[in-house]
Amino acid sequence: MASAREPTEDEIAKFLATRTSSQILQLMRCIREPAAQFAFTAKLLTFNSVKSAKPTVPPKAKKALNAFVGFRCYYIAIPAFKQWPMKKLSNLISLLWDRDPNKSLWSLMAKAWSNIRDQVGKDQAPLDEFFDIICSHLKLPDPASYLDLHGWILIVNDQGDPTLVESIDSKSASVGSSHIDLALSVEDIIAFVRNAGYAPTYIPNDNITSPTFLGQLANSPALEEDQAVAEEYDTPMADTSSASEFQQSLQREMAITEAAASVVGPDPLPDFDFTPFYESVNNLIVEHMAMEQANAGYTQGTQLSNHLVVDSGKAYLGMNDFVVDLPELIDYDAFHFGGNEDVTLPMFDDITYY
């Protein structure tokens, strides 16, 4: 049986150097003899302290490229600016940015480049190469033609500093919008530069939905299903939709026509026989009231040609004891202009209601 050997000096040093603080304290508690504790403590003083493992802190996300910074990095290469130091060009670049009509495009380009840089690194995503590719595609003016295209003239003021003034006579001074008329997204820009050979190691995220309306419409599953059904039956979708709308419109028109035809006049009589007599009575009452109001200025008892009376001796519709004498049925004196307000209105207790 092999006898246990004592560890070497190097093995002991390696063992102690790889222990944690809690393990070192546990070893010290196991040593009972004071001399051994002293020797062990002295040995520990010659080693570097072993720190407890700390959780790995994830690296902070890099700051996204600002749209103005990208604009400045691209147009600082304007040939007329090369003879001036950067501190004299800051105000000029700010003025150009304030009047530039393509700020929205620069925001999209800055966001697209930031996404590429965060994945592949800055070394694999040179900014100048990115702008050379995408600005040419978007038909943005290059640094050499920017001032002339937007009607700017670089002059030197009395203090010897560069100054930009607008050329009123220049036809290009009225440029106020981008030359491109497309609905772009960040993903569209990334896809174009990758197809041009920029940042080939970048892996796009296929789960990201395009924020543009055209991108959402093209990726819509419902639209794909409708198109597949239309192709299967070889039937234009627009024709089917028009036929359905026409049928619904026809049904609405028929319903309106039927509802209008059902209204034939006033409420029917109890025996559901529409008799012209009741219409005549209604007209006589209305005309009589209007005539009495018109004749209010005459004295009471004056015989007028418009004083209408219905013959009370004739019965109508077989109703028993039905007599009509409109002047005696209602006393309108109370309603005359300046009439007697104390007039007594007739009582109707003796009238039988059917």
Curated annotation (Swiss-Prot):
Compartments, record wording: Nucleus
Keyword vocabulary terms for this entry: DNA-binding, Fertilization, Nucleus, Transcription, Transcription regulation
Q: Which Pfam families match?
A: MATalpha_HMGbox (PF04769)
* Protein name per UniProt: Mating-type protein MAT-1
User: Could you say which protein family the record assigns here?
Assistant: Belongs to the MATALPHA1 family.
Alphabetized InterPro entries for the sequence: MATalpha_HMGbox (IPR006856)
Question: Which Gene Ontology CC terms are recorded?
Answer: nucleus
Which range is the signal sequence, renumbered to this chain? none
Which organism is this entry from? Cochliobolus cymbopogonis (Curvularia cymbopogonis)
Upper classification of the source organism reads:
Eukaryota, Fungi, Dikarya, Ascomycota, Pezizomycotina
Q: What does this protein do?
A: Mating type proteins are sequence specific DNA-binding proteins that act as master switches in fungal differentiation by controlling gene expression in a cell type-specific fashion. Transcriptional activator that induces the transcription of alpha-specific genes.
GO MF terms, alphabetically ordered? DNA binding, bending
Q: Which domain of life is it from?
A: Eukaryota
GO terms (BP aspect): positive regulation of mating-type specific transcription, DNA-templated; single fertilization
Q: Give the DNA-binding residue ranges.
A: 60-117
